[in-house]
Amino acid sequence: MAKVHVRKKDTVMIISGKDKGKTGEVLAVMPKVSKVLVSGINIVSKHQKPNKQNMEGGIIRKEAAIYSSKVMLYCEKCKSVTRISHKILEDGTKVRVCKKCGETL
């Protein structure tokens, strides 16, 4: 199981692939397969058979998971992608900090 560098509700930017340069919010993290689900990124068409919940069926467009190595954390303050460092505050809590501007994430 690989450690994933992003968490749920983080804002990330895609750094490679067909959606390169787009930003989105992390909806789910799957550390066992080292993948993340990002809103509005990697949209795929799924052919759905009619069933009791969806009587019509048809083609449904939804997000698919992408590898976590293709995303980087996006800092709102410096408006760019960044790596993170960890810092321990005076009260003993551990926080994530932007390496470029020093803002807590």
Curated annotation (Swiss-Prot):
This is Large ribosomal subunit protein uL24. GO terms for molecular function: rRNA binding; structural constituent of ribosome. One of two assembly initiator proteins, it binds directly to the 5'-end of the 23S rRNA, where it nucleates assembly of the 50S subunit. GO terms for biological process: translation. One of its GO terms (cellular component) is ribosome. Pfam families: KOW, ribosomal_L24. Keywords: Ribonucleoprotein, Ribosomal protein, RNA-binding, rRNA-binding. The keyword rRNA-binding applies. It comes from Clostridium kluyveri (strain ATCC 8527 / DSM 555 / NBRC 12016 / NCIMB 10680 / K1).
